[in-house]
Amino acid sequence: MNKTNKFSPEVRERAVRMVQEHRGEYPSLWAAVESIAPKIGCVPQTLLDWVKREEVDSGQRDGLSSSERERLKALEREVKELRRANEILKTASAFFAQAELDRRLKS
């Protein structure tokens, strides 16, 4: 299920940039986020998530980058689909094997 993004990528980038630029003026990252989030109209946790994601994407923080995360999701979907196809093939194989066995027994 896809959710609609309330904030455009430009707004997100600008908000993250504001946090990064003003981070030194606050005692912690959270304090900077709490101060800036109301100015753009989002909750602090959302802005913190954006900042952390940007830090991961730029290599400043450990974790999967956005592109790696998207690739992982695509691979997980593919694995799920392949497993489903494999189950269908197993069922069909068992069906045809039984049909062949029945045919041989009748002959």
Curated annotation (Swiss-Prot):
Gene3D superfamilies: Winged helix-like DNA-binding domain superfamily/Winged helix DNA-binding domain. GO terms for biological process: DNA transposition. Keywords: Transposable element. The keyword Cell wall biogenesis/degradation does not apply. One of its GO terms (molecular function) is DNA binding. Belongs to the transposase 8 family. This is Insertion element IS401 uncharacterized 12.4 kDa protein. It comes from Burkholderia multivorans (strain ATCC 17616 / 249).
